[in-house]
């Protein structure tokens, strides 16, 4: 039977014996993606993409639809779990040199951009106060593009301000983009298994591989069980932990919130945007904070793939991870000293990681020759 052959191929997939828990996040992302598509479909059935009814339809789903509260909370918290997993997945790729599999890395970065766009469109759909103002601020950045900016913004809004056509467009985009993500994920997995996974040592795994099943299957299932447990605990006991209090009020274009901020998983990029006082400069920095990941495979100069035996790069990497968290924290604070200065310093260190990567590699090569 064809499905038995597929299962056999999957079970016999050769995998390095020494890949650690950090390699489990790929399968967890597939699980998150499946959860988001399923819960998203059931929510879309009851959602109304109209500025007068959108907020009420979310309340209707939560109160009146059987298990609607569960679908809504699973979808919202599931998005946060998705981003936690994807950030760890990217960090593992940076630490262990997985980016040297160039096609896989480039397709993965494209996936990240698509995922961030999908999450942004989804954040606008409840039409709460923070949804509306976050959409206004972020989409308004398009006007910074010379010549085409104003036309592009008007086209995206469907008019001269955020209104009903904007919500309809965002709902359509939020619905269609996950199918693009599924297609790109399939390509990502195919490109990965063409060359095979790396391992913590960064060495060639061909001499020491075992079938994927049963060892790695159970390893994946353990992490999936842990993630599912955490997800259900948050959904059951603290479903609003990631929500902004302002978003429990219906969107009002006449009242500006004290602090406009997107969801927590965009705060690092928003913090970088805020740290530059110039509009065009901020928009470029925001874009570069994600697009710069595309440069990593082409700037690797070290003779060693993994950072496991590179103490200088390890220090740089953990400084980068700490900087990511600091930028996220500063983005939640008011635009006033000392937060502006901390944000600017942290943003500089964020980009310095990508500049220092090839320099550190070159220095390590020199030291090894001594």
UniProtKB/Swiss-Prot annotation:
One of its GO terms (cellular component) is respiratory chain complex III. The cytochrome bc1 complex contains 3 respiratory subunits (MT-CYB, CYC1 and UQCRFS1), 2 core proteins (UQCRC1 and UQCRC2) and probably 6 low-molecular weight proteins. PROSITE patterns: CYTB_CTER (PS51003), CYTB_NTER (PS51002). GO terms for biological process: mitochondrial electron transport, ubiquinol to cytochrome c. The gene is MT-CYB. Heme b b566 binds at residues 89, 188. The chain crosses the membrane at residues 25-45, 69-90, 105-125, 170-190, 218-238, 280-300, 312-332, 339-358. InterPro entries: Cyt_b/b6_C (IPR005798), Cyt_b/b6_C_sf (IPR036150), Cyt_b/b6_N (IPR005797), Cytb/b6-like_sf (IPR027387), Cytochrome_b (IPR030689), Cytochrome_b_C_euk/bac (IPR048260), Cytochrome_b_N_euk/bac (IPR048259), Di-haem_cyt_TM (IPR016174). Its main location: mitochondrion. A ubiquinone binds at residue 193. Belongs to the cytochrome b family. Its cofactor is heme b. This is Cytochrome b. Coiled coil: none annotated. It comes from Eunectes notaeus (Yellow anaconda). Keywords: Electron transport, Heme, Iron, Membrane, Metal-binding, Mitochondrion, Mitochondrion inner membrane, Respiratory chain, Transmembrane, Transmembrane helix, Transport, Ubiquinone. Heme 1 (or BL or b562) is low-potential and absorbs at about 562 nm, and heme 2 (or BH or b566) is high-potential and absorbs at about 566 nm. Binds 2 heme b groups non-covalently. Component of the ubiquinol-cytochrome c reductase complex (complex III or cytochrome b-c1 complex) that is part of the mitochondrial respiratory chain. The b-c1 complex mediates electron transfer from ubiquinol to cytochrome c. Contributes to the generation of a proton gradient across the mitochondrial membrane that is then used for ATP synthesis. Heme b b562 binds at residues 75, 174. It is found in: Mitochondrion inner membrane. It comes from the Eukaryota. One of its GO terms (molecular function) is ubiquinol-cytochrome-c reductase activity. It holds the Pfam family Cytochrom_B_C. It is a multi-pass membrane protein.
């Amino acid at each position: 039977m064809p499905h038995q052959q597929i299962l056999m191929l999957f079970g016999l997939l050769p995998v390095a014996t020494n890949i650690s828990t950090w390699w489990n996040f790929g399968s967890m992302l597939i699980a998150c993606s499946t959860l988001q598509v399923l819960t998203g479909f059931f929510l879309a059935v009851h959602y109304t993409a109209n500025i007068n009814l959108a907020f009420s339809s979310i309340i209707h789903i939560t109160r009146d639809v059987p298990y609607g509260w569960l679908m809504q909370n699973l979808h919202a918290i599931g998005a946060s779990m998705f981003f936690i997993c994807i950030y760890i997945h990217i960090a593992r790729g940076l630490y262990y040199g997985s980016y040297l599999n160039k096609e896989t890395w480039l397709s993965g970065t494209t996936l990240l951009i698509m995922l961030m766009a999908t999450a942004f469109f989804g954040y606008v759909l409840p039409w709460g106060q923070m949804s509306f103002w976050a959409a206004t601020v972020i989409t308004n950045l398009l006007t910074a593009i010379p010549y085409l900016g104003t036309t592009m913004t008007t086209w995206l809004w469907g008019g001269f301000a955020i209104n009903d056509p904007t919500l309809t467009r965002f709902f359509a985009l939020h619905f269609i983009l996950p199918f693009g993500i599924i297609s790109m994920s399939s390509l990502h997995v195919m490109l990965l298994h063409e060359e095979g996974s790396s391992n913590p040592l960064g060495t060639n795994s061909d001499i020491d591989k075992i079938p994927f099943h049963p060892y790695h299957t159970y390893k994946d299932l353990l992490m999936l069980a842990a993630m599912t447990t955490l997800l259900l605990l948050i959904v059951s006991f603290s479903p609003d932990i990631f929500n902004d209090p302002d978003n429990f009020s219906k969107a009002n274009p006449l009242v500006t919130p004290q602090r406009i901020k997107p969801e927590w998983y965009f705060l690092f990029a928003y913090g970088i945007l805020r740290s530059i006082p110039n509009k065009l400069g901020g928009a470029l920095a925001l874009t570069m904070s994600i697009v710069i990941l595309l440069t990593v495979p082409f700037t690797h100069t070290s003779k060693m793939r993994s950072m496991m035996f590179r103490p200088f790069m390890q220090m740089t990497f953990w400084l980068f991870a700490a900087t990511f968290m600091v930028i996220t924290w500063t983005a939640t604070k008011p635009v006033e000293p000392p937060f502006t200065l901390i944000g600017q310093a942290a943003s500089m260190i964020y980009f310095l990681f990508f500049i220092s990567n090839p320099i550190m590699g070159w220095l390590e090569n020199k030291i090894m020759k001594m």
